[in-house]
């Protein structure tokens, strides 16, 4: 058998998920995330992150989630700072910039953003005719396979709050990061240290 690690969605669902779907297949539920199963899932997530006040939405994919989060959080003249290798800068076919929000990709040696890299972008964008950086986008795990430690995320969070920037964590590979032996972050840490994040594979 050949195993492909190209992505986390090349196969169907786990047999237990398929079984649960079969058991509820003939239930009649409201659409648009207004069903009891979605409500239950949201409650489980709130418990896991320790935030009863969390606003949770079910979105169909990573690009759509990135697009919604960034376009809802930013004003038309504001921009998002990310690693040069960041998914929104490289792989989403201009989806973010199509909404009018400039993506400010910063060169990094390891795909990780730091306060110093963010400060460089802030220092460069001071002219009144330039976009105003208002959000920092990070991925965990990153597009090059590195991960943020709790200390690194705490430093980013403190810096962003000091500078009045939103911190958004792309969780397309969050499942891999959270289960990695090298990781020391929990979902509760991420919920506490970021303004927006999502849970992917």
Regions found by a protein language model. Name each.
Residues 1-201:
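Conserved PLP-enzyme active-site core in the AAT-like
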């Amino acid at each position: 058998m050949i195993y492909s690690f190209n992505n986390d969605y090349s196969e169907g669902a786990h047999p237990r998920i398929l079984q649960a779907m079969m058991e509820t297949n003939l239930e009649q539920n409201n659409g648009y995330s207004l069903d009891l199963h979605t409500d239950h899932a949201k409650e489980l997530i709130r418990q896991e992150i320790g935030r009863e006040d969390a606003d949770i939405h079910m979105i169909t994919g990573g690009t759509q989630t990135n697009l919604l989060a960034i376009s809802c959080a930013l004003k038309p003249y504001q921009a998002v700072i990310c690693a040069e290798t960041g998914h929104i800068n490289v792989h989403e076919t201009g989806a973010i910039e199509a909404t009018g929000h400039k993506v400010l990709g910063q060169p990094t040696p390891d795909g990780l953003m730091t306060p110093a890299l963010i400060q460089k972008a802030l220092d460069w964008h001071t002219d009144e005719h330039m976009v105003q950086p208002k959000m920092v986008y990070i991925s965990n795990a990153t597009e090059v396979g590195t991960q943020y430690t709790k200390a690194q995320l705490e430093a980013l969070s403190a810096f962003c709050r000091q500078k009045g920037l939103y911190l958004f964590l792309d969780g397309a590979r969050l499942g891999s990061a959270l289960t990695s032996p090298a990781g020391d972050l929990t979902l509760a840490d991420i919920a506490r240290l970021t303004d927006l994040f999502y849970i992917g594979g």
